[in-house]
Regions:
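Glycine/proline-enriched, intrinsically flexible loops and inter-domain linkers
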Residues: 1-168
C-alpha cells in the first residue's frame, strides 16, 4: 500500500515548513513508521511518526481527531492488521484519540499514525519484495523473519547491500 497517506483520500499531509510557518509550532520529527503496515502478499502502507511542540514561550491545545486508535485496519484474505494509532506526550502521558487537550509549555506530543492492513497471505509475498522492504527500512529484521520467513542468508545479502550502498 501507499505509505504515510490518509484514507480514503490517499493524500499526504501539509509540508512541515508550511505548518511551522503558519503558527508557533515546531515539528520535531516526521518519518515513516517501520513495521506498521500489515504483513501480506501486498504489504499494508506504513504509518508515520510525528512529534510536535510549540515554540519557546508558547503552549497549545491539540484537537485530536484520530482514527484507528482502538481498532487497527484489519487484514484481508490472510493479510495481517496494520498498527494502531498511538498518541502521548513526550513524558509518556497517554492522550485521548479524540477531543481537545492541553499541552503545557515545553511538552511535545508524540503521535504514531496507523499502518494499512496487509492483503493476502504473507507467505505469498515475493522474496525480492520482502528483501527490498527490509533494505528500505519499511520492515525490521524481526518482521522479515517472523512474518515473511526470510532466511538468514537473504537477510545477510540485504545487510551487505546496505553496507556497500547497493540497491536491492
Amino acid at each position: 500500500g501507499l505509505n504515510a497517506t490518509a484514507f480514503p483520500s490517499g493524500v499526504m499531509t501539509m509540508p512541515v515548513e508550511a505548518t511551522e510557518h503558519a503558527g508557533p509550532v515546531i515539528i520535531w520529527r516526521k518519518e515513516l513508521r517501520p513495521d506498521s503496515g500489515g504483513a501480506g502478499k501486498q504489504r499494508g502502507g506504513l504509518g508515520q511518526f510525528m512529534e510536535v511542540g510549540a515554540r519557546e514561550g508558547h503552549e497549545f491545545d491539540i484537537q485530536a481527531m484520530f482514527d484507528r486508535v482502538d481498532h487497527p485496519a484489519n487484514g484481508r484474505r490472510g493479510g495481517g492488521p496494520g498498527a494502531p494509532t498511538t498518541i502521548a506526550q513526550d513524558d509518556g502521558t497517554k492522550m485521548n484519540g479524540k477531543g481537545k487537550q492541553f499541552v503545557a509549555h515545553g511538552r511535545r506530543v508524540v503521535m504514531a499514525f496507523p499502518g494499512g492492513a496487509g492483503y493476502g497471505a504473507a507467505s505469498a509475498r515475493a522474496k525480492a519484495s520482502v528483501m527490498r522492504d527490509l533494505a528500505r527500512g519499511y520492515i525490521s529484521v524481526a518482521v522479515a523473519k517472523r512474518d515473511y520467513a526470510l532466511a538468514d542468508a537473504d537477510i545477510a545479502t540485504v545487510m551487505d547491500a546496505i553496507a556497500s550502498g547497493q540497491d536491492i
